[in-house]
């Protein structure tokens, strides 16, 4: 396992992977990993040559600053869980300043009102925050496949729309929900 904290490190590794014509799988997370995340990682390992997990608590997804402040973070535990899946998973866990400038600007996307219903109805601008960070990750990793859980139905529809808006060649792999035993 390699742990990366800088985009420049990731870019070097990704370019090498692309030159070798290997498939890249991406499993974006905000950490605090559980069985659902681990099942996504297993699926990625089964279907891609190189797998990246991201552990990044994205501030632009939070309307309430206390929720952001109180979001559980335990990188040591997360890394131990990832190692149980495979020693060959790369992990990117940047600081906020590595992903955003000081203003934490989000892009505004036309999600065709998908972001205005269900969870989006109560979390203003949440899905623009999701779209912004996923867009940054897709541009950094250039993944062939990105793995998301079907539990996040609205989010998977948003990501699918984002792929169309940005014309990414990434395949969205929606995996069955796995719960803690």
Question: Model-predicted segments: where are they?
Answer:
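Nucleotidyltransferase catalytic core that binds NTPs
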Residues: 1-181
């Amino acid at each position: 396992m390699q742990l990366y904290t800088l985009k420049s490190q990731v870019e070097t590794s990704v370019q090498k992977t692309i030159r070798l014509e290997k498939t890249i799988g991406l499993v974006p997370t905000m950490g605090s990993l559980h069985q659902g995340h681990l099942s996504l990682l297993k699926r990625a390992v089964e279907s891609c040559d190189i797998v990246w997990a991201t552990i990044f608590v994205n501030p632009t997804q939070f309307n309430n600053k206390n929720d952001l402040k109180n979001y559980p973070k335990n990188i040591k535990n997360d890394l131990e869980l990832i190692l149980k899946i495979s020693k060959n998973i790369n992990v990117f866990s940047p600081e906020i300043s590595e992903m955003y400038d000081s203003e934490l600007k989000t892009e505004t996307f036309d999600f065709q009102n998908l972001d205005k219903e269900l969870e989006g109805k109560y979390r203003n601008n949440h899905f623009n925050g999701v779209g912004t960070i996923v867009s940054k990750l897709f541009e950094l990793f250039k993944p062939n496949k990105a793995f998301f859980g079907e539990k996040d139905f609205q989010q998977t529809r948003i990501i699918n729309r984002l792929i169309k808006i940005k014309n990414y060649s990434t395949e969205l792999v929606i995996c069955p929900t796995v719960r803690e035993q």
